[in-house]
């Protein structure tokens, strides 16, 4: 797994998780949405404690419009990611303080682009995998942030305290998190089919979104 810093960002000390949670003290309600529109926001997990939720936004790349149907391919992947993240500490204990929203982002084609491939897959965020034995991934960060700001309460300021997860509709053990010096972060995660503790999809979510994106932890290997 990889953790890269944008804008010449220096490694920060880890934000005290409990301190961040204490700052989170009322939670809003799910706004009315049009399920047939690109950029639709859904509340996948609402906070039940506090005035201000700790926000996570999940969107997808390489998913067609039909894949965003309720209970469809994207929902299944997003729910799996949410279940994995909140099954481990400290997210498990402080789960009530978190709000998780999903944002639909329609791609023209399923899948992702491999870095050295002769053809590119036409996806909304242009996610590209390094391929081979590398777990590296990248995408159009600015466009991802634009979609994340469609979510309830996610202003430009709040985005700096929000973890954004992009699930790539491509089966490979891969994931990379980009952390910016202003606090923003994006975790790109592919749909790993691995069965080992290291390579399974849920572990990649915890590692990238939880460890790198939220905790600002660096790899130790």
Locate predicted features.
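C-terminal motif of bacterial Sec signal peptides marking the signal peptidase cleavage site
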Residues: 23-26
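Propeptide-to-catalytic entry region of secreted or membrane-anchored zinc metalloproteases
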Residues: 30-159, 169-170, 200
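N-terminal secretory signal peptides that target proteins for export/translocation
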Residues: 1-10
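Sec-dependent signal peptide hydrophobic core
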Residues: 9-19
């Amino acid at each position: 797994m990889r953790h890269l810093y944008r804008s010449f960002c220096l490694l920060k000390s880890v934000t005290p998780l409990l301190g961040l949670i204490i700052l989170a003290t009322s939670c809003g309600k799910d706004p009315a949405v049009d399920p047939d529109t690109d950029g639709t926001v859904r509340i996948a997990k609402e906070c039940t404690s506090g005035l201000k939720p700790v926000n996570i936004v999940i969107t997808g790349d390489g998913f067609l419009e039909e894949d965003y149907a309720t209970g469809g391919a994207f929902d299944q992947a997003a729910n799996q990611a949410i279940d994995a993240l909140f099954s481990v500490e400290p997210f498990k204990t402080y789960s009530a303080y978190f709000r998780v929203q999903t944002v639909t982002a329609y791609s023209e084609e399923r899948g992702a682009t491999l870095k050295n491939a002769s053809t590119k897959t036409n996806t909304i965020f242009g996610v590209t995998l390094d391929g081979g034995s590398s777990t590296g991934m990248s995408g159009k960060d600015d466009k991802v942030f634009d979609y994340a700001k469609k979510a309830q309460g996610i202003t430009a300021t709040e985005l700096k305290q929000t973890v954004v997860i992009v699930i790539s509709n491509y089966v490979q053990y891969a994931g990379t998190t980009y952390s910016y010096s202003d606090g923003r972060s994006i975790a790109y995660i592919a749909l790993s089919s691995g069965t080992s503790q290291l390579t399974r999809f849920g572990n990649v979510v915890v590692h990238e979104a939880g460890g790198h994106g939220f905790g600002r932890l660096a790899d130790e290997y």
